[in-house]
Amino acid sequence: MTSQKGLRYDGSIDKYPITEGEIYSLGNGSKITIADITLGLPEFSKNADCVFIDPAGSKGVLKAYYTKAEKQCPVDNFDEFVAHIKRCIEQINPDRLFVECFYRNKKQLVPMVESLFPHVKIYENTYYHKPDCKCWIIQGTKQAEDWGLQGMDEWDAVFKICKDVPFCSITDFFMGQGLVAQAAYDAGKVFYGSDMNRNRLAVAISKVAKRGGEWTVTK
């Protein structure tokens, strides 16, 4: 059973009690809100020209995410979840897509990206800055590009993407605790974030605030 402390993460929800329907915004137009992609994307996310996502790696992991968000998992299998991801990307129609994946979900996510973009590049990466923790970043682009992400830790890769890739705005519809938000904020870029877990989003909001971000809240 998930502990109450685990559900609340670091307790940022007490300071940033984001609720359904609220939008947290920065002066540059960056926004964060609660959303479940199986029910649809926030409209502002569709304005992004770049996407970075790190989706659940399996049906079991996905179910655990919903449990932590105190919600019922609405999909019957992982392929159905991937179909929702693809639909969201099609609605956004970005110039560039970056999808972090693992051994368990790579076989579903690579074909998905290949069906959406004419140019696909796969970087081999690590996570937690541990050489034995392997992951991949699948890059989909409209033109052939190499952003030098091979061999990087995924944390560093996200900061490099936000610093070097010439996008106007980036969205992460699995924002979680806000790695993309932090990287985009540091790079002076606009970001759009959403997640179904309000406690995780509160952590993201807090981390950006600690970097100097000043949030306003609207309904």
Features from the language model and the residues they span:
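Class I S-adenosyl-L-methionine-dependent methyltransferase catalytic core
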Residues: M1-K219
